[in-house]
């Protein structure tokens, strides 16, 4: 049989495979979502509230996180839009994990938990120290002292997870690569379509904030050489002399 010129619908939230072998993402906001939701539909919340202009025709409010703003026209092409949506969700999830990983060890260290190095951008260099990395004093993690071993584990484990996500599982069953469900949803958070639609919005809102936070952490590391919590403590102790403007006017790269 041939699929030429036809679109095969695989699952309610899965991509459509078209005859030209290109993928287009179907909307993930279920039709059963209440029309009263403030995050979906033509009457959804806009980026400037009541002062927002008319959104582009291709931003109809069917996807989570659509506030009707696309000055650069990045979402005008459906295929590019589908790809960017997937990239945003994946980067949001990594950013949320990364932001937690940057702050939590430093928080524990400031409360008496001993680390070899708690500041996120300095921790990796400890592998070159005489004692190597200190995983909370656990001697069973000796293999994590090897850069090659760490690299190999990252390639194998992350490659397997990404391959599983994109291919739809080890048996090749088709799932939504952004919201795979099934064994990835052991708590059944997606069972209620309306609750699931709201969770998608919350995930993107928190993910976008986390991406900005990670950008701020990188800038802080370059400019101050300190972790985020230490920078926060310095600012609270002396907000006049420890703020973005003060550092921007005195910052000399490389010094």
Swiss-Prot record:
Binding site for chlorophyll b 5: 154, 251
Transmembrane spans: 89-109, 141-161, 209-229
Binding-site residues, chlorophyll a 6: 235, 244
InterPro entries: Chloro_AB-bd_pln (IPR001344), Chloroa_b-bind (IPR022796)
SUPFAM superfamilies with a match to the protein in the record: Chlorophyll a-b binding protein
Residues holding chlorophyll b 2: 93, 142, 171
Binding site for chlorophyll a 5: 202, 220
Residues that hold chlorophyll a 4 according to the record: 206
List of residues binding chlorophyll a 2: 91
Residues binding chlorophyll a 3, per UniProt: 126, 136, 203
Keywords, sorted A to Z: Acetylation, Chlorophyll, Chloroplast, Chromophore, Magnesium, Membrane, Metal-binding, Phosphoprotein, Photosynthesis, Photosystem I, Photosystem II, Plastid, Thylakoid, Transit peptide, Transmembrane, Transmembrane helix
Record's bilayer topology term: Multi-pass membrane protein
Primary location class: plastid
Entry-annotated residues carrying Phosphothreonine: 28
Disulphide-bridged cysteine pairs: none
Record's comment on post-translational modification: Photoregulated by reversible phosphorylation of its threonine residues.
An annotated GO BP: photosynthesis, light harvesting
Binding, chlorophyll b 3: 146, 162
Post-translational modification N2-acetylarginine, affected residues: 26
Sequence positions that bind chlorophyll b 1: 47
Family membership noted in the UniProt record: Belongs to the light-harvesting chlorophyll a/b-binding (LHC) protein family.
Subunit description: The LHC complex consists of chlorophyll a-b binding proteins.
Function: The light-harvesting complex (LHC) functions as a light receptor, it captures and delivers excitation energy to photosystems with which it is closely associated.
Name of this chain's protein: Chlorophyll a-b binding protein of LHCII type I, chloroplastic
Species of provenance: Cucumis sativus
Lineage: Eukaryota, Viridiplantae, Streptophyta, Embryophyta, Tracheophyta
């Amino acid at each position: 049989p041939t699929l030429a010129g036809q679109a095969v619908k695989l699952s309610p939230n899965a991509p459509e495979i078209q005859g030209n072998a290109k993928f287009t993402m179907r909307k993930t906001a279920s039709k059963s979502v209440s029309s009263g939701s403030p995050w979906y539909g033509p009457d959804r919340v806009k980026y400037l509230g009541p002062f927002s202009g008319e959104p582009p025709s291709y931003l109809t409010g069917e996807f989570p996180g659509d506030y009707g703003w696309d000055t650069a026209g990045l979402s005008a092409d459906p295929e590019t839009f589908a790809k960017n949506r997937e990239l945003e969700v994946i980067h949001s999830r990594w950013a949320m994990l990364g932001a937690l990983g940057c702050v939590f060890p430093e928080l524990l260290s400031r409360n008496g938990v001993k680390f070899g190095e708690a500041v996120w951008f300095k921790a990796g260099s400890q592998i070159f120290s005489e004692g190597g990395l200190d995983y909370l004093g656990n001697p069973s993690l000796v293999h994590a002292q090897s850069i090659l071993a760490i690299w190999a584990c990252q390639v194998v484990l992350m490659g397997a997870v990404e391959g599983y996500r994109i291919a739809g599982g080890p048996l090749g069953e088709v799932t939504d690569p952004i919201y795979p469900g099934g064994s990835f949803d052991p708590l059944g958070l997606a069972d209620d379509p309306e609750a699931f639609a709201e969770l998608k919005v919350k995930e993107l809102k928190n993910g976008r904030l986390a991406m900005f936070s990670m950008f701020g952490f990188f800038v802080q590391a370059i400019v101050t050489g300190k972790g985020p919590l230490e920078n926060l403590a310095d600012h609270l102790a002396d907000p006049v002399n420890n703020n973005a403007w003060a550092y921007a006017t005195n910052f000399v790269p490389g010094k």
